[in-house]
Every structure is written in C-alpha cells, then in structure tokens.
Amino acid sequence: PEPSRPLAPSRPSDEDPSVISPLGDDDGHRFKRGLLIHRLLQSLPDFATGERLAQGKAYLSRSIHDLSPGKQEEILAETLGVLTHPDHAGLFGPGSLAEVPITGIVAGKNGIHVLSAQVDRLLVTEEAVSVIDFKTNRPPPETEAQINPRYLRQMAAYRNALREIYPDR
C-alpha cells in the first residue's frame, strides 16, 4: 500500500485558493504584511517587554521591507496588541516556544492521516498545552460563528496530535 499524503492543516484547500489574481489590486502586500507580523510575533518575545517597541521599529524600518512610516506603525501596533493582550501573556512569556513542528497520527473525516505541521507558538505547562496560530490574511472574526471552518479543523488536528503527546493535559 502507498502511504497517505501527510495532512498539512494550514495548507489552503480548493475552496480558498492560494493564487492571487494578477488583475487584483493587492500587489502581494497582504502576504508581506502577514510575513512581517509572523516574524515579529516570533522574535519580539525574546526581548524584554520594554525593548520590544524599539526592536520592532528597527526591524520594520529596514529598507528591504519598503514600508511607509504609517504602515510600519500599523503593523507594529497590531503586533504589540497581540503580544500584550492578557489572554496571550503565557504564550509569549518565559518557556513558550516559537515555530514548533508537530507531527502525529490523527483521525479525519477520510480516515487516519499523518499530521505534519508547524504552530506559531506553543506553551506546555503542568496543567495544559496551549497553541496559538495566527491568521493574518483576513480581518479577525468578531464571533466564534464567523471563524472559517477550515481553521477550526486545523486547530482540532493540532489538539488531537498534542493529546497523544501530552495525554494528561
């Protein structure tokens, strides 16, 4: 038998194409914005809280990013808003990890799959395992009902794999 293709929950499905129309107005800015925010969310927690603003400004002002001062401020404000939000404090504090690979065997609607993924942040404590995975390509939903079902399936796959690794949490 042929091995199944690894399940990669963050890979876009057919219902949400990853190719942007060359006739669109975006010029790839939403992808650039997402990459920059992800990079800041990965690296800024390594700095003391009081240093994060200056480090973020230094990173975003690099000429290679080609960002206006206003766009730099917008991206940094959004990033720092996530980092300082009380609900996320542990995920950006001591002991948390960035860009963590997760592999495992998970059950899906079409049978058993090998999961191969990378989560943005992971925190393992004595009581729980917490994961945060950022979606910067769209405005955040205001209610749980507005969350794209694909993202719910993605997080469920992560939860199922992590339950196998950390069954008591």
Model regions: which residues?
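Structural signature of nuclease core domains in nucleic-acid processing machines
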Residues: P1-R169
